[in-house]
Amino acid sequence: MTYAWLALAGDAYAQSAATLRIESLAASCAGCHGTNGRAAAGSAMPRLAGMPRDRFAAQMRAFQENRRPATVMHQIAKGYDAEQIHELAAYFERQGP
């Protein structure tokens, strides 16, 4: 019985750690794009919340490859690997419009 409880606790901890990891990555976007990707009304920054994951990932790749004009996003995007971009894309898509 104890082992089953530990296994369940381990799964919950792993999910918790994964959730904290992605929320931490997403928090770095909040300064410009708003909390959870919800940019303020009238903001010049694009809203990330609800953005389709394929679009988000394509935009990040475009920044990484200097194919999209930007001021700081080239440097920011280059700080993420493909897995992190995939996780961020899924996170922001789940935030809904």
Language-model segments: residues:
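C-terminal capping alpha-helices of c-type cytochrome domains
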Residues: R68, A77-P97
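The canonical Cys-X-X-Cys-His
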Residues: A27-T35, L88
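Detector for the c-type heme attachment site
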Residues: H33-R38, E93-R94
